[in-house]
Amino acid sequence: MDLRVSEANGYAERELALEMLGEHVDRRATVGADRGYDTRDFVARCRQLEVTPHVVQYEHARRRSAIDGRTTRHEGYALSLHIRMQIERIFGWVKSVGGLRRTRFRGRRKTQIAAYLVGAAYNLLRVARLRRCAQ
């Protein structure tokens, strides 16, 4: 799991995702993502990295989805979509409780440090919940 901050330009999220996948994937893997990642370029580059993209299909009359039928028919695709909903809850927590909906800091470096701190706080909460469940 990685957490990185970038500028909001419409392409940076996908570029960072591919960069992180290239650094961390050493065997066949899958990646789940929302509709914003359903582009031919992103899907093709994921396949080059031997990563199966489980991206929510962007259904629109003028544009076809970059995800083909052999991916969506697989039972792992439906499971990934379910897990993605749980992950979206984490993003909601980071934005609301963690305070990262709008940054208070100037500069990418300071914002990145704040994001790491919020991520660490969330992980500590998860550990506390797991310990409570184990007892």
Describe the predicted segments one by one.
Residues H24-D26, A115-Y116, R126-A128:
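Short, intrinsically disordered/low-complexity patches at protein termini
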Residues L16, R89-G92, R126:
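Hydrophobic side chains within alpha-helical segments
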Residues R28-G32, T52-V55, L130-C133:
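Acidic/polar loop patches that form or flank catalytic/metal-binding clefts of enzymes
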Residues V97, R101-R102, L125-Q135:
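A short, flexible helix-boundary coil/loop motif
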Residues M1-R45, G119:
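Polybasic low-complexity intrinsically disordered regions
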